């Protein structure tokens, strides 16, 4: 944001993915996330503000409190994500499919923030296993994310329950016994395997073999007549 005005003027920026029928900001998909920045002017000519301690996933931004009529060059959206090089490309004869691929790449980058997030806009922004499991293959083929996933997988391994071998469903996160679900925790061995298939590096398997074995043994203790009980999260909608 580039702005000028009297000292003490308060500028508020609110972010959302949609607008209502009347043109007002629709923050429904933000859930409990405030998605709001407030900047107070010094009053010394043109000033520039950019968030340093947060990020926002949005399509629309509402600017409140400008002391002058706004100009298009006063506001700029900047893309922020983990610095991963583009390593894959896709072309075909169908512009619609190519457009879907471009949108997928943008969605993926928007959720690479040191770990694979579930969403960049609302009040979670967490490393849910289910989301990472269904997108890791695409991320590995489109971007140089082997180091990214190596770091994430190492965190999962270190955070494994030392008592019974169980694995949580979110990382990074301290382990808590929150009804772990194999349909989500199994992202751990799945993503390890995907990294190996893409890289051919057996170190992925060697590093995580023991932790994965302990996890499979844990699932065996939960099974009844070789059938695991119903867990709470399941496919969770689109994931």
Predicted region positions:
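Residues at helix-coil transition
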Residues: 109, 157-158, 200
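Extracellular/oxidizing-compartment recognition motifs
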Residues: 2-121, 130-131, 147-150, 164-174, ...
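Well-ordered alpha-helical scaffold segments within catalytic/enzyme domains
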Residues: 66, 134-145, 188-204
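Hydrophobic core segments within long, regular secondary-structure runs in both alpha-
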Residues: 98-101, 105, 146-157, 189, ...
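Aromatic- and histidine-enriched alpha-helix N-cap/loop-to-helix transition segments
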Residues: 123-133, 144, 179-190, 207
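N-terminal hydrophobic signal/anchor transmembrane helix of membrane proteins
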Residues: 137-166
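Tryptophan-centered motif/residue detector
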Residues: 128, 152, 184, 188, ...
């Amino acid at each position: 944001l580039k702005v000028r005005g009297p000292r003490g003027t308060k500028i508020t920026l609110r972010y959302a993915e949609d607008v209502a029928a009347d043109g007002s900001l629709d923050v429904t998909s933000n859930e409990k996330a405030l998605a709001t920045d407030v900047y107070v002017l010094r009053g010394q000519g043109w000033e520039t503000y950019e968030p340093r301690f947060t990020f926002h996933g949005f399509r629309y931004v509402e600017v409140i409190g400008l002391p002058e009529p706004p100009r298009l060059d006063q506001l700029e959206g900047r893309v922020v994500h983990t610095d991963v090089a583009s390593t894959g490309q896709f072309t075909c004869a169908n512009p619609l499919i190519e457009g879907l691929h471009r949108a997928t790449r943008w969605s993926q980058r928007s959720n690479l923030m040191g770990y694979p997030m579930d969403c960049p806009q609302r009040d979670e922004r967490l490393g849910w296993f289910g989301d990472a499991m269904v997108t890791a293959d695409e991320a590995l083929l489109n971007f140089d994310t082997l180091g990214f996933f190596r770091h994430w997988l190492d965190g999962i391994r270190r955070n494994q329950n030392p008592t019974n071998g169980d694995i949580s469903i979110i990382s990074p996160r301290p382990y808590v016994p929150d009804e772990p679900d194999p349909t989500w925790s199994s992202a751990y061995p799945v993503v390890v395997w995907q990294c190996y298939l893409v890289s051919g590096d057996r170190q992925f398997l060697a590093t995580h073999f023991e932790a994965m074995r302990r996890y499979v043994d844990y699932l065996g203790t939960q099974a009844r007549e070789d059938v695991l009980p119903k867990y709470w999260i399941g496919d969770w909608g689109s994931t």
